[in-house]
């Protein structure tokens, strides 16, 4: 644990990743405390003043598909420049609720935006930069839908159909298959204690 690392939490809406993120970060901070390092917790879209304004627009206003993708990457560039890159340069660890995998899954898999367009934006905004670890909370869309149904008023993504989330999930799993060294897949259908046991194994490997 000598240098800063970048960890992302991913999954379709209703997978439960955000529920477990704070717990994971508290445990990670306990491991890092002796080395004098901090855990920076952030999210996408968001994480900066501009990013949070874009988040409000992206989650609630209908827009052209390509406009949506461009705004996602604009928020990401600001996030990298102001939060992620400075924290890693200090030697701190960053844990983000979503990153670029979400854009490929939602705008690519879910909405059908061609992958080559997203790859072009990815190269422009972040070069070859990728998370050191991506924790993917995997759950069937029907299960996630039941969980979302009991939550607050849904945003425009949470209101999407099971078919949309099936495509989104498939893209997440495709990316995990292409980069098994980077992904840790969590069975998010399990109970909270069982999921935390899975996360303990992830923490132990860091």
Curated annotation (Swiss-Prot):
Gene3D superfamilies: P-loop containing nucleotide triphosphate hydrolases. GO terms for molecular function: ATP binding; dTMP kinase activity. One of its GO terms (cellular component) is cytosol. The keyword GTP-binding does not apply. Keywords: ATP-binding, Kinase, Nucleotide biosynthesis, Nucleotide-binding, Transferase. One of its GO terms (biological process) is dTDP biosynthetic process. It comes from the Bacteria. Disulfide bonds: none annotated. SUPFAM superfamilies: P-loop containing nucleoside triphosphate hydrolases (SSF52540). Its EC number is 2.7.4.9. Belongs to the thymidylate kinase family. This is Thymidylate kinase. It comes from Burkholderia lata (strain ATCC 17760 / DSM 23089 / LMG 22485 / NCIMB 9086 / R18194 / 383). The lineage of its organism: Bacteria, Pseudomonadati, Pseudomonadota, Betaproteobacteria, Burkholderiales. The gene is tmk.
